[in-house]
Amino acid sequence: MAGTITHLVIADRLLEPLQIRRPALFYCGNLAPDAIMAREGYQREMKRHTHFKDGIRLRDLHLPRCLAQYRRAFQSFTDRFLRPDSPDCELYLGYVTHILADEVFILTLRDAHVRRLAAEGRDPDDPAYFAAFGRDVDLNDWQLVREYAFRYPMPDILLQEQNYEIPGYITRRELQSSKAFIIEKNFLTPHEKREPEVFSYAENTRFIEDACLYIQKAIRDWTS
């Protein structure tokens, strides 16, 4: 799915359209769904749960029954947490923007790569191809770190919020542990600089544009 820095760039570009008042909390909410990987004994199915896709493989999300199941879980989360009177509403709004961006990523970009492999007579689930894809996600993220001008200083602003959790999904400890890992990996450690192999920076840039448009429409539809 989309890279961590790519998610943060999307969140950054949504600050003004969504009229975010607590940007640090919104950024942190945007990082939250993947923080489950900091859980002791982490297994892949746990991440499916935090992304509202219990039992759903990425390749199957487009199937009507899978998409309907995902949307029900999404609606359940928004009904529970996205209350305008909640002081943490923007934390959960950040969480939702991550999920919506991944939805766009899976149903458009990832599926396009799968179709391309199939058209070439190759295994649509080729492990080597998607290992290269994953490396390219990091390379594209690190180019964003070097080139994208965030509206607030990164990673400093991520440290302004510490006391938060996503009840029933991610604990405070997991969120803090994951955030520390993200900062170390993406902002403190020297990055490899080379051209992506299968997932280009231009392709990632187009995805960011598409995701921002989709998320704004989805949020407008939800609040109207």
Regions found by a protein language model. Give the residues of each.
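N-terminal leader/auxiliary helical segments
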Residues: 1-224
